[in-house]
A protein has these predicted regions:
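Ser/Thr/Asn(+Pro)-rich, low-complexity disordered segments
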Residues: 1-487, 493-496
Length: 496
């Protein structure tokens, strides 16, 4: 096969349709089972849910997965509006009052009983914040706000508390926070290809420019079972960050954003406006299907918890120079913990309708326990299930099933003020107000006022903020509208 032909090859995954339509009785039963996790692990005093079964701690990422589960439970008829409202009111009230790391952003972890800051051993104290976790939370707060505008005021008040001074810079780079040996905050760039861009979409939905975080570069291509899979080419040895390639961020972007840009309000399920996210997702999927076809090993790779030490691993398609690398966050190679991730399997099933994902559904359908939800995964080596239950796994499974019924989970409310469903946004009106004393100190984004905001300002005598000087002009390599040239998808061993 000539190089040109290789470059023009289309992966089979690109032709697989997504699954859309009402849930079957079988699929609805899976949704009901997944929701049981959030019944068993709910903390009524705070409205939070344990990230791991019977362990009273959570993160912003896992709490966003709870919002996904809560939305799916209501939309799929598992709970009614009263139950949904009561849970969401309590959750948002807690999120609006939790102590923040350095009075800036949500801490990396909270005790679900007390809603106080804790470390990863659930001991009181603050340890930093994660821009990746917060990006997922921002995305789900936006979904809640758009789907249920009656809660928009509560959602906006949550985000208006946050000080974005250190989490995002003028070039659109996302940073996390840690504490040094003297308990002083240290801010470092956070995120690698896939996770970084997924989190950036959450910030974009609130008006932030995430130019550096949202671009695919720098990346290289790994030849994995005939598929050229993109991976982040920043050196893990010098950056102390592993370049995990996992299913999860690509699946989540597909389920929640429809592989669209953050400003795409189209309801067309067949079109995907993001310039490369679907293409890269197809590659990550295809490498896993090809692995099954070539080796006979069912594959659905993602990060997951364990029921034994080391308790958490990144189970990857590629990481740190190796295909199918299963490592801890410290980089220790632990191949015996490789597993079929249930959330990855069901997410792939929703986004790629194929005989392979049919088989994945068959193997995971009953992999759970009554009142606990679904297992975290099934060991690839045949050692049985990972007998651990988590909010993230069950939450993503629920949103995958909701995607089948409703399509893209982010559904914008109308921005037509004459429409009865229109909801004015406290966030937007605060951001355009030149007299608000926290807009600049909290590094809130500048948004261009639309007709509704201009009209509101004229009616109330509020002066509009002027566009700031081009702070991002010092970032010449980053252009939001830069054209994207997709790399070749396959090597010569894949037949056209």
């Amino acid at each position: 096969m000539s190089p040109a032909a290789v470059g023009d090859t289309q992966l089979p995954a690109a032709a697989y349709p997504q699954r859309h339509g009402d849930l079957t009785a079988r699929e609805q039963a899976m949704a009901v089972k997944a929701w049981q996790y959030f019944v068993t692990n709910y903390q009524p005093a705070t409205g939070l849910v344990n990230a791991v079964n019977n362990y009273p701690s959570t993160t912003m990422w896992d709490s966003a997965s709870y919002l996904a589960a809560l939305t799916a439970a209501r939309e799929l008829g598992i709970i009614d509006k009263e139950q949904f409202d009561q849970r969401l009111i309590k959750f948002l009230a807690t999120l609006n009052t939790v102590p923040l790391f350095q009075n800036q952003m949500p801490n990396k972890a909270y005790n679900t009983i007390t809603a106080q800051k804790v470390d990863y051993l659930n001991k009181p104290g603050e340890i930093g914040f994660s821009s990746i976790d917060i990006g997922r939370m921002l995305l789900w707060l936006k979904i809640i706000k758009e789907r249920y505008p009656e809660f928009a005021n509560d959602v906006d008040n949550v985000v208006l508390r946050w000080d974005f001074s250190h989490i995002i810079d003028d070039c659109g780079t996302l940073s996390g926070a840690n504490l040094d040996a003297n308990k002083q905050p240290v801010y470092v760039q956070e995120g690698r290809l896939g996770y970084e861009e997924y989190a950036a979409s959450g910030f974009q939905l609130w008006g932030f420019s995430t130019c550096q975080a949202a671009r695919a570069e720098p990346y290289q291509l790994a030849d994995i079972y005939c598929v050229l899979v993109p991976y982040d080419s920043r050196d893990p040895r010098t950056t102390s960050q592993h370049n995990y390639v996992a299913t999860e961020p690509y699946v989540l972007h597909g389920l929640e954003m429809g592989w669209n840009t953050s400003d795409d309000r189209s309801a067309d399920l067949a079109k995907h406006s993001h310039p490369w996210m679907q293409d890269f997702a197809n590659r990550v999927y295809q490498a896993q299907e090809n692995r099954y076809q070539i080796t006979g090993r069912l594959t659905a790779r993602s990060e997951h918890q364990l029921d034994r030490a080391p308790y958490f691993v990144y189970d990857t398609v590629y990481s740190d120079g190796f295909d199918w690398n299963t490592i801890t966050d410290k980089g220790e190679y632990v191949p015996d913990t490789a597993a079929i991730s249930l959330k990855a399997a069901l997410g792939m099933w929703s986004l790629w309708q194929s005989p392979y994902t049919d088989r994945l559904l068959d193997v995971i359908e009953n992999a759970g326990e009554k009142d606990k939800g679904f297992y975290e995964g099934l060991y690839e080596n045949g050692a049985g299930p990972i007998r651990e239950f988590t909010a993230n796994n069950n939450g993503i499974m629920l949103e995958a099933l909701l995607f089948k019924k409703q399509g893209r989970l982010l559904k914008f409310n109308t921005n037509d003020q004459s429409d009865g469903k229109y909801a004015p946004a406290l966030w937007d009106k605060t951001l355009v107000n030149v007299f608000d004393t926290k807009n600049t100190p909290f590094n809130r984004p500048f948004i261009t006022p639309d007709a509704n905001l201009k009209s509101w300002c004229q009616q109330t005598g509020v002066a509009l903020r002027n566009a700031p000087s081009c702070k991002a002009c010092k970032c010449p390599q980053c252009q939001n509208d830069a054209p994207v040239k997709l790399p070749p998808v396959a090597t010569s061993c894949l037949k056209p």
